[in-house]
A protein has these predicted regions:
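Mature catalytic core of soluble alpha/beta enzymes
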Residues: 1-237
Length: 237
């Protein structure tokens, strides 16, 4: 239900655009009481389907239902959006493009975004593709070789640091090294990461389904071998 954290993603963008730590802290629920209260309130609304939910009546229509209580709170806070795919957006866009392109008969090549999503369309198995691997060591992002693969694949790269230009307004690093990331949880409205990075891939699912399956594991206190085995049993590696 993280897509219902739209107001908090807007606050996170303000945090990440800050010029110094004092300004950033005003938008940080870990450092500011008002921001913490807001994060808890929005998360409580986001968790409850009675407060916010989507309905798909058909004919390419979608209806967003928002409770009177949430509408009143949003008006008081000056919110302009309830819904935002934020860092997840390109996973859904790439899947849409891949399905559209395949529907027109194209089955070669890859579609990728700079923020860590890849969809390989090649069903021939005749060509190898590569994905670069990185690891954060201290404050340095180090190259750790490449992953070679073939055949249809969806790749999702979770990372707790800025890995490219799209991350500029999604991450913020304080002077003491503390990092804020876009991986907000609907449980409390705060960001959580289990490791500096996690790369998952699947030959069975698109980017969006792969992301959704692995997201909660990446938000845990630490990466669990058992949870990764569960993902593997679902053909997500």
């Amino acid at each position: 239900r993280e897509i219902y954290l739209g107001p908090l993603y807007a606050s996170l963008e303000n945090l990440c655009m800050s010029n110094d730590d004092a300004v950033a802290a005003q938008f940080d629920p870990e450092k500011d009481d008002d921001a913490a209260e807001e994060a808890a309130a929005v998360a409580a609304f986001a968790q409850n389907p009675d407060d916010i939910s989507m309905e798909f009546p058909g004919e390419n229509q979608v209806c967003l239902h928002v409770s009177d209580a949430y509408q009143a709170y949003a008006a008081e806070m000056g919110y302009t959006a309830y819904l935002d795919f934020f860092w997840m957006k390109n996973a859904f866009l790439i899947d849409y493009l891949a399905d559209t392109i395949r529907g027109e008969g194209y089955q070669l090549g890859i579609i990728s975004s700079k923020d860590g999503f890849v969809r390989c369309l090649d069903e021939t198995g005749e060509k190898e593709y590569q994905y670069p691997l990185y690891h954060l060591s201290g404050n340095e992002i180090q190259s750790h070789g490449t992953m070679t693969y073939e055949g249809p694949k969806s790749i999702v790269f979770f990372h707790a640091y800025q890995a490219g230009s799209p991350d500029t307004y999604r991450y913020y690093q304080y002077q003491d090294g503390t990092m804020r990331t876009p991986y907000l949880s609907a449980s409390d409205g705060k960001d959580h990461t289990a490791a500096s990075e996690l790369l998952v891939y699947s030959g069975e699912y698109g980017c969006a389904d792969t992301l959704l399956a692995a997201f909660f594991d990446y938000q845990a206190e630490s990466l669990s071998g058992e949870s990764l085995k569960t993902l593997a049993s679902q053909k997500i590696y």
